[in-house]
Amino acid sequence: MRLFFALWPDADTRAQIANAAAALRLAGDAQRVPRENYHVTLAFLGEVTTSQLAVLQQIGRGQRAAGCTITFNAYDYWPRHQVAVAIAREAPAALTLLWTQLHRDLVLHQAALNLKRPHSPLRTHITLARKVAQAPVLQAMSPFHWNARSFSLIRSDTSGPRSVYTVVDTWQLLYE
């Protein structure tokens, strides 16, 4: 199974993301991401076995990070990946801490996990469209806020015509 750790939005946040995505002007054959697939990736894990899944769930349970509010305030286009994204120009300290702890624990458990993929830096974004071959007009975005109260382990099924994401497990973030 193909897995990743992510922030997974609640219904209100999903609606805000959908509004931002609808306002983005795309050209050509760009494909908008279905609203049920919106997320912020914390760590892409790739193909994982059942025994590795147990270790990943242990890592998820072990995180002690605070919840936070993320302000998404700009559109961006990444030509190398051919995606249009909503970005947060500044990541909250609590999100950076969660990302750092999660990646530290993935490295600490590397012997049990044997993950092949390198860890990429934190780039707080939500993919809004894929196969964007032509740079969209990046107008100003109406900012929206995501109150991150939990993070999840997500399964990605790419066997059909489009990716289907399923929540495998969720852990609450701490609030004081």
Enumerate the language-model features and the residues they cover:
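Histidine-dependent nucleotide/RNA phosphoesterase domain, centered on the 2H-phosphoesterase fold
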Residues: 1-176
